[in-house]
């Protein structure tokens, strides 16, 4: 379609919307200035650059389409290509396992700001801001329990990891002069029935209290709940109820992943309820098929309803938008 035809069609639509009291120019300007945080892990099937092994710990990618990113250079090239093809404003969301480790193994309780300085510089050069995630899965010490583990040695390992990740996020936020949003999600749970559910939740609460005690002005922490994970079907320590209570009580940002709820649950209905009790929301927009299958997001009814609720609540400044899916059966760049 020629530019003049598009312009003419828009002017007609603009006039119709104006009759209803809608300023389309302002709406487009708002859209252009509302960033979406692209998740780096779609580009390489959640493998990362720590061990080069498939994801585990309650999550799984399916498919074997060729062309996934094999190193940091390829991943950055893919993100640059995506940015060139899409209109709008973007951030980049990194997991800890995507650091620049110089060919050496750096365990997760040893990671530091120096492993992400290259990402900070790259993001600055490409006019992107960074967000971050601690990474509790796909590790020999992941097991079925991390921050909720009764074994103090393992629990302390993951507490130290998460503390270090918050400091990395703080450095990112200060470097880019804009808060880096760091998400904490742990897969902790059990495959079968659990006798003492309260015990594990008490441990998780204590771990989070210790982690979040450090004041880091360059970042914002958010906590993510989940219904269940593969191999952890019977019980999830960090359930929706747990994190709703924790975030409301402690004034912490809540992460709402659209795949982490019952299949028949209307996730968009959570927006207006959570906004009354938590300071901000982080959205991980996905498309669940019967469970948290992490299919590529579509602008379907569920997604439309989600964003309608945010706009109607005038909460675009309190609801941060991010993507979270990983489909290895299609072109990785096209997936964005």
Residue ranges and their predicted role:
Residues 1-150, 157, 166-168, 178-180, ...:
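Alpha/beta catalytic barrel-like cores
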Residues 96, 186-188, 225, 258:
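Short glycine-centered, acidic/aromatic-flanked micro-motifs in structured strand/loop junctions
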Residues 123, 162-165, 169, 173, ...:
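Hydrophobic pocket-lining residues that define ligand/cofactor binding sites across diverse proteins
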Residues 128, 174, 252:
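Short glycine/serine/threonine/alanine-rich loop segments
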Residues 134-136, 188-190, 227:
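Short, flexible active-site-adjacent loop segments at beta-strand->alpha-helix junctions, enriched
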Residues 154-157, 161, 199, 203:
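Alpha-helical initiation/capping and key positions within long helical/coiled-coil segments
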Residues 166-195:
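Active-site groove signature of glycoside hydrolases
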Residues 193-302:
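Acidic/histidine-rich catalytic cores of soluble enzymes
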